[in-house]
Regions:
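Long, intrinsically disordered low-complexity tandem-repeat segments
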Residues: 225-258
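A short, conserved structural fragment
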Residues: 316-329
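Short amphipathic alpha-helical interaction segments
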Residues: 302-316
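Catalytic cores of DNA base-excision repair glycosylases
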Residues: 7-221, 225, 250-263, 272-279, ...
Length: 339
């Protein structure tokens, strides 16, 4: 890999990296794994307080495995996508049973854990164990598509990394494993803070002079792709639109103001009135109760009976709620305390 990319990227990260607890020198592999699961589809600001509470209560896999799965759901609070809490609890029990209570360093062993895909396995192996792997989250994929391929990345968070993306990422990894791991988190941070989807700040980018996308004039994704905007007069995608800076090689300089122009806007998903909101309300009732709850407790927080039934059935099917023989409902593993 060219030092023209590695050196400025790593120097920028050393100056600008956010102070996050899972990046601290003493962070354990378990801490890194928990953070990666929590950060799936959830921003850092929401994760941070819940992560700190979780790690205070369950600093090791054994501590979590010793409690019922329902307690993991209760502690998960309002982070969303609560099946992640179930997967973390299941992972903890597997770590205790098969790995001596420790997170394995082997990539295949990590992939075999519940809810751990290629990205999360590579992230844990890299960030917790200093290994050399391509870590391809949304931010990294966007940065590398722009920087090395000169392309506006039009993928979405739910799209899987392609073979071409993986090969590109692997070709850019520094040879030394520890440096490669730091490179991976540096690229991720650059995508989160500077090379953002909708408002990239090219003037603050440490590798702007090497950026093929900037040199090409920041081309937009094709119409109809994820990130392309349908607004009349818009010139770019989510990820396009910040002005180039004078003196940056190849920049399409005067396209915007000094602070950058926001061109594409992400569509916000409707939440009010959805099944997801209903599920959240029902889980909130259970999380706030010390005993199992009656059906009437659910009726009190959601008026639409058909939707309530559908949401409750889904929670039961997902293993997030246990229906009890007496007609009440509880978080999984909870013991009825009273009638």
């Amino acid at each position: 890999m060219s030092t023209s990319l590695a050196e400025p990227m790593l120097a920028w990260y050393a100056r600008n990296a956010r102070d996050l607890p899972w990046r601290a020198p003493g962070a354990t592999p378990w801490a890194v794994l928990v953070s990666e699961i929590m950060l799936q589809q959830t921003p850092v600001a929401r994760v941070l307080p819940e992560y700190l509470s979780w790690m205070t209560r369950w600093p090791t896999p054994a501590a979590l495995a010793a409690e019922p799965a329902g307690e993991a759901i209760r502690q998960w609070g309002r982070l969303g996508y609560p099946r992640r809490a179930l997967r973390l609890h299941e992972t903890a029990t597997i770590l205790v049973a098969r790995h001596g209570g420790s997170v394995p360093a082997d990539l295949d062993a990590l992939r075999a854990l519940p809810g751990i895909g290629s990205y999360t396995a590579a992230a844990v192996a890299s960030f917790a164990f200093g290994q050399r792997h391509a870590v391809l989250d949304t931010n990294v994929r966007r940065v590398l598509a722009r920087l090395a391929a000169g392309q506006p990345w039009a993928g979405g968070a739910s799209s899987a990394a392609s073979v071409a993306e993986r090969r590109l990422a692997e070709s850019l990894l520094p040879a030394e494993p520890a440096v490669a791991a730091r490179w991976s988190v540096a690229v991720m941070e650059l995508g989160a803070l500077v090379c953002t989807a909708a408002s990239p700040r090219c003037g603050d980018c440490p590798v702007a002079r090497e950026c093929a996308w900037l040199a090409a004039g920041r081309p937009a994704p094709p119409a109809g792709t994820a990130g392309a905007t349908g607004a009349a007069g818009a010139t770019g995608a989510a990820g396009a639109g910040a002005a180039g800076t004078a003196g940056t090689a190849g920049a399409a300089g005067a396209a915007g103001a000094a602070g950058g122009v926001r061109v594409g806007r992400r569509r916000t998903q409707k939440y009010d009135g959805t099944d997801r909101q209903c599920r959240g309300r029902l889980l909130a009732v259970l999380r706030g109760a010390s005993d199992p709850v009656h059906r009437a407790d659910f009726d009190a927080v959601w008026a639409g009976q058909a939707q309530l039934e559908r949401a409750l059935d889904g929670l039961v099917a997902d293993g997030l709620v246990d229906p009890l023989p007496d007609g009440r409902f509880a978080l999984p593993g909870s013991q009825p305390l009273s009638r």
